[in-house]
């Protein structure tokens, strides 16, 4: 019986393990503490259930596991509600009739924030996925606007066609790079442009009403209205767009926590009246959700604030890095708590990072995190500390430069690398000017007739240059003389004309007197 009881307990444990993934993962992610700990032993846990940018962190390549964790910052899901709202976005189901700018302005008024932006304009009659970024998340708007989009639309054909297969073939033909001109009523200049259609297919066709439902995956800035007109031209019957809905923008689609304007209004009302922020946290998502498709680079806590101030992303500050990083690829730099620090352009591949121990890993493209979220950890070395003490005592000026009180030993020992780099930069143009210019090559006809003369020394200019200079001087002198002569002639002409006028006046007076 004892053996039977033992086997039943084991079975229960197995059932419990199996039931873990079926639990509400979102609640666990909000309640538990998630952090990459500074230890050499990797914990045996299921990191596929970790939230946002920390998902599967144990599968990243490890450069080092040792760093000093700082209490600053917080997991994106555990931020205070004010910070959570200011660094979030809403996957909004845009209603028909209001424009995208009106919708964004309404959300700004509802949430009482200063700044909002959206992921790409939708026409007033178009519904569907509109990503509304709030305050700090507006730094990601540019990258979201250029991301690919997916649409489901209804096209109305002006005349009947032979079969549904004909329409399906025509829709699939309109793929690849296509010429497009914006519609007659458009907010932009009607210039011819090229846009790429990645994939398109017919979903359904009603031959009685001549309506076809189609799905399109396309580049940002594609006009589906123009695509429907082209479809009608291709079939030879004419066509126009009847309805349109955006089902995906970037990496977020209809099924990814899409909310309505009423949900946003209710969530804010619930927080204002009942101090319940759970609805706001459900409606607004952290900005890190938009970056889950990027390759990751995990930085030490001590390097975070330096990057926020624009420092280079150097290899000694890197803890972990992802497989498959390529040159000039856009990556996301994150903290050990899973917060996005910045977007960057990779200057090293994964292979180079694994073999090097120094150098610049990536170039900052856009800083996302606010400055001084983490403490400053630069200027804490012995020389920097000594310099701060000397500034306090008045031995150096407020900029750290020598003054009358500065001891001679400091002037001799201390090397200001900023000034030395400026001097080197100033020397470069002088060195370029001092480089000897190569003598001009003669034409082939001249070189054949004349003997080759040795090149003149750089101290004395060649006779050709002297003769050119003399010619220029002579020309200038001639022009000056001509100008002077012309001036004298003009004066003489003016004087002659004035004398003639006086004579005429005298004659007129004499005539008048004689007549009287």
Swiss-Prot record:
InterPro entries: Dyskerin-like, PsdUridine_synth_cat_dom_sf, PsdUridine_synth_N, PUA, PUA-like_sf, PUA_sf, tRNA_PsdUridine_synth_B_fam, TruB_C. One of its GO terms (biological process) is snRNA pseudouridine synthesis. CDD domains: PseudoU_synth_hDyskerin (cd02572), PUA_Cbf5 (cd21148). Its EC number is 5.4.99.-. Residues 434-446 have a biased composition (Basic and acidic residues). Belongs to the pseudouridine synthase TruB family. It is found in: Nucleus, Nucleolus; Nucleus, Cajal body. Its main location: nucleus. Disulfide bonds: none annotated. The active site is at residue 123. GO terms for cellular component: box H/ACA snoRNP complex; Cajal body; nucleoplasm; telomerase holoenzyme complex. Residues 463-516 form a coiled coil. Residues 469-478 have a biased composition (Basic residues). Residues 1-24, 422-516 are annotated as: Disordered. Residues 453-464 have a biased composition (Pro residues). Catalytic subunit of H/ACA small nucleolar ribonucleoprotein (H/ACA snoRNP) complex, which catalyzes pseudouridylation of rRNA. This involves the isomerization of uridine such that the ribose is subsequently attached to C5, instead of the normal N1. Each rRNA can contain up to 100 pseudouridine ('psi') residues, which may serve to stabilize the conformation of rRNAs. Required for ribosome biogenesis and telomere maintenance. It comes from the Eukaryota. Part of the H/ACA small nucleolar ribonucleoprotein (H/ACA snoRNP) complex, which contains NHP2/NOLA2, GAR1/NOLA1, NOP10/NOLA3, and DKC1/NOLA4, which is presumed to be the catalytic subunit. The complex contains a stable core formed by binding of one or two NOP10-DKC1 heterodimers to NHP2; GAR1 subsequently binds to this core via DKC1. The complex binds a box H/ACA small nucleolar RNA (snoRNA), which may target the specific site of modification within the RNA substrate. This is H/ACA ribonucleoprotein complex subunit DKC1. It is an enzyme of class 5 (isomerase). GO terms for molecular function: pseudouridine synthase activity; RNA binding.
């Amino acid at each position: 019986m004892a053996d039977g009881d033992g086997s039943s307990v084991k079975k229960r444990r197995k059932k419990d393990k199996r039931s873990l993934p079926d639990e509400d993962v979102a609640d666990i992610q909000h309640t538990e503490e998630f952090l990459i700990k500074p230890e050499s032993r990797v914990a045996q846990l299921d990191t596929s259930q970790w939230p946002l940018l920390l998902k599967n962190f144990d599968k990243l390549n490890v450069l080092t596991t040792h760093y000093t964790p700082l209490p600053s910052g917080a997991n994106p899901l555990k931020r205070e509600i004010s910070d959570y709202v200011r660094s979030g976005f809403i996957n909004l189901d845009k209603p028909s009739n209001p424009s995208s700018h009106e919708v964004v302005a309404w959300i700004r008024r509802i949430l009482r924030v200063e700044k909002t932006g959206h992921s790409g304009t939708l026409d007033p009659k178009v519904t569907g996925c509109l990503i509304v970024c709030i305050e700090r998340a507006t730094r990601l708007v540019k990258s979201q606007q250029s991301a690919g989009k997916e649409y489901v639309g209804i096209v109305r054909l002006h005349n009947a066609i032979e079969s549904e297969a004909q329409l399906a073939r025509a829709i699939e033909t309109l793929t690849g790079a296509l010429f497009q001109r914006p519609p007659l009523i458009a907010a932009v200049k009607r210039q011819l442009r090229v846009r790429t259609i990645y994939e398109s297919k017919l979903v359904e066709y009603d031959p009685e009403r001549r309506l076809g439902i189609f799905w399109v995956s396309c580049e940002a800035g594609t006009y589906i209205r123009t695509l429907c007109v082209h479809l009608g031209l291709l079939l030879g019957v004419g066509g126009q767009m009847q309805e349109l809905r955006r089902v995906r923008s970037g990496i977020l689609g209809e099924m990814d926590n899409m909310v309505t304007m009423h949900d946003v209004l209710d969530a804010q009302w619930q927080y204002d009246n009942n101090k319940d922020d759970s609805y706001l946290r459900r409606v607004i998502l952290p900005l890190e959700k938009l970056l889950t498709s990027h390759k990751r680079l995990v930085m030490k806590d001590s390097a975070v604030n330096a990057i926020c101030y624009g420092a280079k992303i150097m290899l000694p500050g890197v803890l972990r890095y992802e497989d498959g990083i390529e040159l000039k690829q856009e990556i996301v730099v994150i903290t050990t708590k899973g917060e996005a620090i910045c977007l960057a352009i990779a200057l090293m591949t994964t292979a180079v990072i694994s073999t090097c121990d120094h150098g610049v890993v990536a170039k900052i493209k856009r800083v996302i995190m606010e400055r001084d979220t983490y403490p400053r950890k630069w200027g804490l070395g012995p020389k920097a500390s000594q310099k701060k003490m000397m500034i306090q005592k008045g031995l150096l000026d407020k900029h750290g430069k020598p003054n009358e009180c500065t001891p001679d030993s400091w002037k001799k020992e201390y090397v200001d690398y900023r000034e030395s780099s400026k001097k080197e930069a100033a020397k470069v143009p002088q060195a370029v000017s001092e480089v000897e210019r190569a003598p001009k090559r003669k034409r082939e006809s001249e070189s054949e007739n004349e003997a080759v003369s040795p090149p003149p020394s750089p101290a004395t200019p060649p006779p050709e240059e002297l003769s050119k200079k003399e010619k220029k001087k002579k020309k200038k002198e001639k022009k000056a003389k001509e100008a002077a002569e012309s001036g004298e002639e003009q004066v003489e002409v003016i004087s002659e004309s004035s004398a003639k006028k006086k004579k005429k006046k005298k004659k007129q007076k004499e005539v008048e007197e004689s007549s009287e």
